[in-house]
Amino acid sequence: MKHALPLALFALLLAACGGGRYHGPTAYDLHGQRGAMRPGGDYTVRPGDTLFGIAWRYGLDIQELANWNSISDPNHILVGQRLHTTPPRGVALRPVHIPQISSNGQPGWSWPTRGRVISEYNANSPGGKNLKIGGSLGQPVNAAADGEVAYVGSGLTGLGRAVVIRHGNVFAAYAYLDNIRVKEKQHVQRGQQIASMGIGPQNTPALYFETRQGSQTANPYSYIGTTPRY
């Protein structure tokens, strides 16, 4: 990331994701899944780390992590720097309200692509807190709501090429992509094509779609609804 954004973000654990095609996460890749590491004690910054990525792996809000460690610029951390992964005494995590799941979802949201859900959201699985939608290679992947592009690249481990969009106070990750059509800081509208569907698990076309609000990963159905709308 080159731009400072006041984000509670999806994060970067820089790793090679050859050509943007998904080939299944390695054991190392799984450490990039949100919440794969439990907060507690300090974390020592390693080469290639970003605050964005560290917050992601611990399931934390990047701005809160920055505040706990007196970091004024979330894009500037040093190799060897020790970071507290729990709040100081007397400081609580900010509460997050996630909408209940409904058939229609939230106003202003729609499904990001056409197809059949091939993997449902699983709150008990670090790698399963997302929807995977199967379809046809090259079919349009669209913004699920109006928003601003926060990230474009292949630094989300195990996900190939990805786009993260800030939709108000919700961040959505779209991954397994080909032919990305947007850039960081670009404003997009609901239904606007942002990329094409690439190859997902089992070498079949798919879209990985994950939503996050504050420090919590949320079931995408809370926003897009269980009944497809395009």
Please place each PLM-identified region on the residue numbering.
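Conserved, short, structured surface segments that act as functional micro-motifs
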Residues: 163, 186-230
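Zn2+-dependent peptidoglycan hydrolase active-site motif and core
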Residues: 149-178
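Short, acidic/hydrophobic/Gly-rich beta-strand patch recurrent on exposed beta strands
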Residues: 131-134, 161-167, 208-211
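Extracellular LysM carbohydrate-binding repeats and other cell-envelope/extracellular binding modules
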Residues: 18-28, 34-44, 53-56, 60-93
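Conserved positions in beta-strands of structured domains
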Residues: 118, 148-150, 178, 195-198
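Short histidine-centered loop motifs in beta-beta connectors
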Residues: 70, 167-191
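C-terminal motif of bacterial Sec signal peptides marking the signal peptidase cleavage site
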Residues: 13-16
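Surface-exposed, glycine-biased beta-strand/turn segments
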Residues: 78-160, 189-190, 218-221
